Structure formats: C-alpha cells, structure tokens
Amino acid sequence: MTLTKVEIAENLTRKLELNKTEAKAMVESFFEEIRATLADGHNVKLSGFGNFELRDKASRPGRNPKTGENIPVSARRVVVFRPGQKLRARVEKSKPKG
C-alpha cells in the first residue's frame, strides 16, 4: 500500500476533526514549505523523522544503453532523504508483509 496526500488529508480530517478543505490545505502547505525551502538551497530537518538534503552531483561520462554511445551527464543538484534514527528503529521493528 502507498500512502497519498489525499489519504493523509483524510486521516487528518478523521483524527483532528478538520473539514476536508482545511485538511487538504494543511497537507499542501506542509509540502509546499518543504519544496520552497529546498528550492531556496536549504536542507530540511524534521526531528524524529529525517532530513531532506541537497547534494550536488558532478558531471560524469555516461552511456546510451541502446547505442552504447558515450554521452556526458551534466552536473545537477539532487534531493536526498536520510531517515532519522527514530524512523529507522520503527521501520526495523515492523514486520514484513507476506
């Protein structure tokens, strides 16, 4: 199962007794704050959950898998998520389904 933003908003509606519009706005606002902070070049640290960090990747040689031709892969900035200790511990305790 994958949790979506809509499902998060529905859970907030139920747990916090918000109306659907307020819950959806809260979820959108939360993620927009993360997006804006990363776009401004800053990392995001969510205590007890994890960190969203920006990393600069250097340009490197690449290869077209269909033709085998060498092509350059340009330098770029990527977002990396590093789970926090509490999140890792909780996930490790959960039982795999199957």
Swiss-Prot record:
GO CC, alphabetical: cytosol
Q: Which GO terms describe its biological process?
A: DNA recombination; positive regulation of metabolic process; regulation of DNA-templated transcription; regulation of translation
- InterPro entries from the UniProt entry: Hist_DNA-bd, Histone-like_DNA-bd_CS, IHF-like_DNA-bd_dom_sf, IHF_alpha
The organism's place on the tree of life at top rank: Bacteria
Q: Could you cite one Gene Ontology molecular function of this protein?
A: DNA binding
One Pfam family name from the record?
Bac_DNA_binding
Residue ranges for the region (Disordered) are 54-74
Q: Which UniProt keywords apply?
A: DNA recombination, DNA-binding, Transcription, Transcription regulation, Translation regulation
What's its job? This protein is one of the two subunits of integration host factor, a specific DNA-binding protein that functions in genetic recombination as well as in transcriptional and translational control.
Q: Which family does it belong to?
A: Belongs to the bacterial histone-like protein family.
Q: What do we know about how this protein assembles, alone or with others?
A: Heterodimer of an alpha and a beta chain.
Can you name this protein?
Integration host factor subunit alpha
Organism of derivation: Actinobacillus succinogenes (strain ATCC 55618 / DSM 22257 / CCUG 43843 / 130Z)
Whichever gene encodes this chain, its name is: ihfA
